[in-house]
């Protein structure tokens, strides 16, 4: 079996149906003795250019291992599902299991934001006191 990386974009109005779509694709892959090595739901993101007059889409990334027939079934499912705006399938030489750069940067940004917010609150609390001391 070969390894593939698949990214598909879902219409933003259909974001609520993404978990069901993921589960449907998961059952197709695992039903044919395939494996999902990595599954990331990137959520709603801004598009680089409008697609069908839309400026946002819901992104999903999957790294899978499956045979050609299963891949054709998945791609057929993407093509005939009106909620899927675009899909891209890339053949990989080996399984990719570590988080993508987008997922890493998202978790790093959240971790960086939390301490920065605490520091700004402390600084904001110190400023009024220092102004009062300077005026006295």
Swiss-Prot record:
GO cellular component: cytosolic small ribosomal subunit
GO molecular function: small ribosomal subunit rRNA binding; structural constituent of ribosome
Gene3D superfamilies: 3.30.70.60
Keywords annotated in UniProt: Ribonucleoprotein, Ribosomal protein, RNA-binding, rRNA-binding
Chain segments carrying region Disordered: 96-136
The keyword rRNA-binding belongs to this UniProt entry's keyword annotation: yes
HAMAP family in the record: Ribosomal_bS6
Similarity comment: Belongs to the bacterial ribosomal protein bS6 family.
Function: Binds together with bS18 to 16S ribosomal RNA.
Protein name per its UniProtKB record: Small ribosomal subunit protein bS6
Native source organism of the sequence: Methylococcus capsulatus (strain ATCC 33009 / NCIMB 11132 / Bath)
Annotated gene: rpsF
């Amino acid at each position: 079996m070969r390894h593939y990386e698949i990214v598909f974009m879902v219409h933003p109005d259909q974001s609520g149906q993404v978990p069901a779509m993921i589960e449907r694709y998961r059952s197709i892959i695992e039903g044919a003795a395939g494996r999902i090595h990595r599954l990331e739901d990137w959520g709603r993101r801004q598009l680089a250019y409008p697609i069908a007059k839309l400026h946002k889409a819901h992104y999903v990334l999957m790294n899978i291992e499956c045979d050609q027939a299963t891949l054709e079934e998945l791609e057929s499912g993407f093509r005939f599902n009106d909620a899927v705006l675009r899909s891209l399938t890339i053949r990989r030489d080996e399984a990719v299991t570590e988080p993508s750069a987008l997922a890493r940067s998202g978790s790093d940004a959240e971790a960086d934001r939390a301490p920065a917010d605490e520091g700004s609150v402390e600084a904001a609390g110190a400023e009024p006191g220092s102004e009062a001391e300077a005026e006295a």
